[in-house]
Amino acid sequence: MPATDDATLAVSVVVPACGRMDLLDRNLDALMRQQFDPQRFEIVVVDDEPNHNTLHLVAGWRTRTLERGPRLSYVANSGPSGPASARNRGWRAARAPIVAFTSDDAVPEPTWLSEGLAAFQDGLDVVCGRIRTPVPARPTEQQRSARVLEEADFTSANCFLRKPVLERLEGFDERFNVPRGSDADLHFRLLEHGIAIGRAPRALVVHPVRPAPWGASLLQIRHAVFDALLYKKHPALYRQKIEPRPRWDHYLIVATLLLGLASLLMGLTIFATLAFAAWLLLTIRLCAHRLRGVAHTPAHVADLVLTSALLPPLAVFWRLTGALRYRVRFA
């Protein structure tokens, strides 16, 4: 590995890792193929689940690129786990004046660094590149949801920030200890501090969508608890950019279900029948909305049909849990 003086470094690339060896290996391969002087950038891999496998993978890449690659370092995240915490460990260990963030499951194009840095002009402190998520014409619901990254105003899978800005804002809020909320929170704080965000559309990162297990939406909905924290910190921006109004359809579905159960317990058969009929119609409406424009394979349709009955109660539970946990009026 060529000797790298701090004064020659232009950018530090921070890659949070969480035990996905094959994805991290692919990511490092893409970073080693950057069309950028290897003496002008470094790679900081932050292991969010410290283990020997990640350490050995990084060591293997360091050995193979000893003479021609950039400086590659391994940082174990010994603090609170989560992507926000890992990114904070990474940028604090970075030696360059600009920090580039990407993800272990992302694949930066060869010109990613050069195009991203070229966009730093006119006093810009923050630049966002472009994300491409390849999905089929008839995607699964998970794949369709992942495509929102292509239109995101800010994502840590492809962004560049001057280190003083990160120091000023104290980086990512580590209370968001899941892959939800921390990117939006930092984006909103940048906006609130009047920090302009430049665009580098040719700084491209490909973000393949991993296969999701059956019923994945039921596991992911628990992250909605952090929506309350994001709303508490940035109520106006939350309503402007994320959710203009509460998901009243979920609350209505839960209300009709509870009304039906209560009526049944009280022996009010007619009321129970009407309430359950309303619940069924609303659930069918939700399911039809989720099925629109996605793959209609038997397994995927069965997934959406069954989870449509369970999602509203879980969503309401986790949102109200967040409201109580963070002491905010949030629905």
Language-model regions, residue ranges each:
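Catalytic donor/gating beta->alpha subdomain of glycosyltransferases that bind UDP-sugars
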Residues: V178, A184-Q240
